[in-house]
């Protein structure tokens, strides 16, 4: 048994999509989530910048004495996870491996499309992971640099829908049956993706598989909490705590959710 909290990090509010699934799967566990909204988007930054920014969030979570860390950010998973896993004792769980497994299991015609930030796409992390599971699957990748910042700014449905349609335009006439939301921000506007793609396309949200994998790791390593009541949840951001809290309340349905602003630059 281990009563320490689970740590989660993201470049911004997208991590709430993973927090939600983790809370649903592990209701007795406590969590600490930090979103680095002051420095988002990560998707247009250099490898060195992404590693350093992610390292700051990891250090913050370690100060909170977490028992494992979930990189609830595809860009951080693709770029920083290999380096930072060697720097900490706690296991780090990424979203790309889980999302790739779900995509490989879902596709029937062995054609999968992935939308993500430019850095994630340029790393070809999803392509490598999906093909590792099934070399016969064709993976089509599209960079969507405008979506994560747009979601952070909390625009209306029509604005989001237009942006989604622009972003997936390069996939027109491609015969894929499965679409991966390759950025944890994207499930926040999943309805817009459903309308833009049509109801025949299966949409994969890696957060579902991340929560299941986290459960499996904790069972294997004896990390479950001994508490039988609902866990406690803390939320932090390097950006605007009011905007961060608003998105959290809306997506998690926690009417009393509050977040705290932190400065991770001097950790």
UniProtKB/Swiss-Prot annotation:
Enzyme Commission code(s) on record: 5.1.1.3
Catalytic residues of the enzyme: 73 (proton donor/acceptor), 183 (proton donor/acceptor)
Key words of the record: Cell shape, Cell wall biogenesis/degradation, Isomerase, Peptidoglycan synthesis
Pfam families membership: Asp_Glu_race (PF01177)
Residues at which substrate binds: 10-11, 42-43, 74-75, 184-185
Keyword Cell wall biogenesis/degradation: yes
GO biological process, one term: regulation of cell shape
Entry-linked Gene3D superfamilies: 3.40.50.1860
Record has Cell wall biogenesis/degradation as a keyword: yes
InterPro entries: Asp/Glu/hydantoin_racemase (IPR015942), Asp/Glu_race (IPR001920), Glu_race (IPR004391)
Pathway annotation: Cell wall biogenesis; peptidoglycan biosynthesis
MF annotations from Gene Ontology: glutamate racemase activity
Top-level taxonomic group: Bacteria
Catalytic reaction(s) noted: L-glutamate = D-glutamate
Similarity comment: family membership: Belongs to the aspartate/glutamate racemases family.
PANTHER family noted in UniProt: GLUTAMATE RACEMASE (PTHR21198:SF2)
Protein function: Provides the (R)-glutamate required for cell wall biosynthesis.
Protein name: Glutamate racemase
